[in-house]
Amino acid sequence: MKLQVLPLSQEAFSAYGDVIETQQRDFFHINNGLVERYHDLALVEILEQDCTLISINRAQPANLPLTIHELERHPLGTQAFIPMKGEVFVVVVALGDDKPDLSTLRAFITNGEQGVNYHRNVWHHPLFAWQRVTDFLTIDRGGSDNCDVESIPEQELCFA
């Protein structure tokens, strides 16, 4: 099957998580007016432990054509990925309880100025870079036992 890749927007992505960006977002000034603070862009939710981690993940570019055959989810915490050098990347997401609901499977491409924060229990493809090696600032839950993986029928990403 082919899965159409759509431009990422908060409206289209809202069921799956938050788009982390400054475009069309409110801000206020701090530090004597020298800084615009774009406050509360995403909810970080962590259950059953007291440690939120900030990490850097260095992702390798995916091989083309890109096919998706598994999704993962994190039931105990949100997970955010923010590209550190303005790189475009692709996210694949789905809703569902015990298994991904393929009727909700969606793929999005960022504009290079966006990050994503997956809600708890949102199925998503593991992180990968798009065109070149990419460093991602990652915010998620520490500890183990927070990753479910499910195989899905193969999907080939289709770019307009």
Swiss-Prot record:
One of its GO terms (molecular function) is ureidoglycolate lyase activity. The gene is allA. It catalyses: (S)-ureidoglycolate = urea + glyoxylate. Its cofactor is Ni(2+). NCBIfam families: PRK03606.1-1, PRK13395.1. The keyword Flavoprotein does not apply. Induction: By glyoxylate and allantoin under anaerobic conditions and by glyoxylate under aerobic conditions. Keywords: Lyase, Purine metabolism. Pathway: Nitrogen metabolism; (S)-allantoin degradation. InterPro entries: RmlC_Cupin_sf (IPR011051), UAH_cupin (IPR047233), Ureidogly_lyase (IPR007247), Ureidogly_lyase_bac (IPR023525), Ureidoglycolate_lyase_dom_sf (IPR024060). This is Ureidoglycolate lyase. Homodimer. One of its GO terms (biological process) is purine nucleobase catabolic process. Belongs to the ureidoglycolate lyase family. It is an enzyme of class 4 (lyase).
